[in-house]
């Protein structure tokens, strides 16, 4: 569903929320605490892969994944980080000439590589005119201490948000979608990141096959959803992104759905909104 595609929950900023009559802190409010001007994320594809794609932890990647479905046209690995950012800027500058930007390392696992290569790409992005910070999307099992050492230093001189793909708090669901890590791994990564003073975000997909809150009686579904929210609330997350499940043609999950449609709950728009509201109220 596209009604609520992404929702961020952030701490503090209560007065601003009251002024806007919001019951949660959205991402734009969160950014306004750090920047006096409008800020836009620009997605990047820096040519990384994932350990559940290259054989280290498995093959094929996550069963729902097809990065090309959300990457902008300019995100091509044959283009440098700088070129991708400049092309992304051109799109927004037509409407907002004073816009500033966050370089969003989004595609695949953006901490999965040699430390010097990672540092070079991050620093290249920060050198582009108008870029005022980084958002780095990654997996919880791809954050070595050596990289955290560097990110801790980087965090002292620029805006930095590390966004972890948690996806589910249920280990059986994580196994089913071929994530290759546990929820405990996610919790540990978030805690280690927060201990360094680095802002961390969590990404959750609502409605994955096998989630307990997608089946059973209404009371059973609500209780299962509360369990997930309580697990997330216990983490020292700065932001939380809730994303609806999308079945993309050609993915393994789409094939599984074609074979056994009853195994995957397809929410209506109203049901999707109700689940998000329940999550917001709980966390």
What are these language model-derived features?
Residues 82-89, 118-123, 148-152, 186-190, ...:
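Generic structural signal for well-ordered alpha-helices
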Residues 263-283:
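C-terminal accessory regions of radical SAM enzymes
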Residues 210-232:
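Catalytic cores of alpha/beta
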Residues 68-88, 92-115, 130-143, 159-186, ...:
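Core AdoMet radical
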Residues 1-63, 67-102:
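N-terminal [4Fe-4S]-dependent radical SAM core
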Residues 206-217, 238-267:
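Flexible glycine/acidic-rich beta-alpha junction loops that bind and position SAM and/or redox cofactors
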Residues 93, 122-129, 151-159, 191-195:
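Acidic (Asp/Glu)-rich catalytic clusters
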């Amino acid at each position: 569903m596209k009604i609520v595609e992404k929702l961020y929950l952030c701490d503090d900023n209560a007065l601003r929320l009251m002024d806007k009559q919001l019951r949660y802190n959205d991402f734009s409010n969160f950014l306004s605490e750090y920047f006096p001007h409008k800020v836009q994320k620009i997605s990047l594809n820096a040519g990384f892969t994932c350990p559940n794609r290259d054989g280290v932890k498995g093959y094929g990647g996550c069963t729902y994944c097809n990065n090309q479905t959300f990457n902008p046209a300019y995100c091509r690995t044959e283009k440098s980080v700088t070129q991708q950012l400049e092309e992304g800027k051109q799109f927004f500058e037509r409407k907002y000439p004073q816009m500033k930007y966050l370089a969003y390392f989004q595609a695949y696992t953006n901490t999965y590589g040699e430390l010097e290569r990672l540092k070079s790409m991050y620093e290249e992005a920060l050198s582009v005119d108008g870029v005022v910070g980084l958002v780095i999307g990654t997996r919880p099992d791809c954050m070595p201490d050596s990289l955290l050492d560097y990110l801790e230093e980087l965090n002292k001189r620029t805006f930095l948000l590390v966004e972890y793909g948690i996806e589910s708090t249920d280990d059986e669901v994580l196994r089913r979608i071929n994530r290759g890590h546990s929820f405990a791994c996610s919790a540990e990564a978030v805690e280690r990141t927060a201990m360094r003073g680095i802002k961390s975000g969590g990404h959750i997909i609502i409605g994955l096959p096998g989630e307990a809150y997608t089946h059973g009686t209404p009371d059973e579904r609500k209780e299962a959803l509360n369990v997930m929210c309580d697990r997330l609330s216990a983490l020292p997350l700065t932001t939380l992104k809730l994303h609806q499940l999308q079945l993309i043609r050609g993915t393994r999950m789409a094939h599984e759905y074609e074979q056994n449609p009853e195994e995957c709950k397809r929410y209506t728009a109203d049901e999707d909104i109700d689940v998000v509201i329940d999550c917001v109220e709980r966390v």
